């Protein structure tokens, strides 16, 4: 059976960094942003809406592979806490919430070329997830 860790948290919290620090060679990493870039997105975040269906199709295939036991360990990065818990329950995995204080998140957002969009996404994430963080 595959060991699955679903990692969630607001934009700029360090989800991808945390997974890269904990994953081992050969582990499957399912990361929306990484998939988008591999599919041709010119930016690392906030991809064109037309790409969403293609990205989710790749994620669905990866999840099917996890269910089929094709991987020893898998890491799935999803932003929302509720969806992370749903996936973990579906796959028999665990959830890790990566978070930082807002001042840290906003400082990291300032280093992105799309800082205003990222800051808005942080605020929206907080509004949608604040009561579901654990």
What is the predicted function of each stretch?
Residues 24-91:
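Conserved nucleotide-sensing/catalytic segment adjacent to the nucleotide-binding pocket
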Residues 21:
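Active-site signature of alpha/beta-hydrolase-fold catalytic machinery across serine-
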Residues 1-5, 71-72:
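Pre-Walker A (Motif I) flank of P-loop NTPase domains
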Residues 77-79, 90-109:
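Conserved phosphate-donor/acceptor-positioning beta-strand/loop module used by diverse small-molecule
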Residues 4, 8, 106-134:
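Conserved GTP-binding G-domain of TRAFAC-class P-loop NTPases and closely related GTPase folds
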Residues 5, 28-30, 94-96:
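Hydrophobic/aromatic beta-strand patches that form the interior of the parallel beta-sheet core
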Residues 18:
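Hydrophobic positions on the alpha1 helix immediately C-terminal to the Walker A/P-loop
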Residues 14-15:
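Conserved glycine(s) of the Walker
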């Amino acid at each position: 059976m595959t060991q699955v860790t679903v990692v969630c948290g607001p934009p700029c919290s360090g989800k991808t960094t945390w997974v890269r620090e904990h994953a081992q060679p050969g582990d499957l990493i399912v990361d929306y942003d990484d998939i988008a870039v591999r599919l041709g997105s010119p930016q690392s975040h906030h991809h064109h809406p037309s790409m969403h269906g293609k990205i989710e199709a790749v994620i669905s295939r990866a999840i099917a592979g996890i269910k089929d036991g094709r991987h020893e360990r898998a890491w799935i990065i999803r932003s929302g806490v509720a969806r992370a818990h749903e996936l973990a329950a579906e796959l028999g995995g665990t959830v890790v919430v990566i978070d930082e204080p807002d001042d840290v998140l906003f400082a990291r957002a300032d280093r992105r070329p799309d800082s205003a969009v990222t800051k808005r996404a942080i605020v929206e994430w907080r509004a949608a997830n604040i009561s579901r963080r654990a």
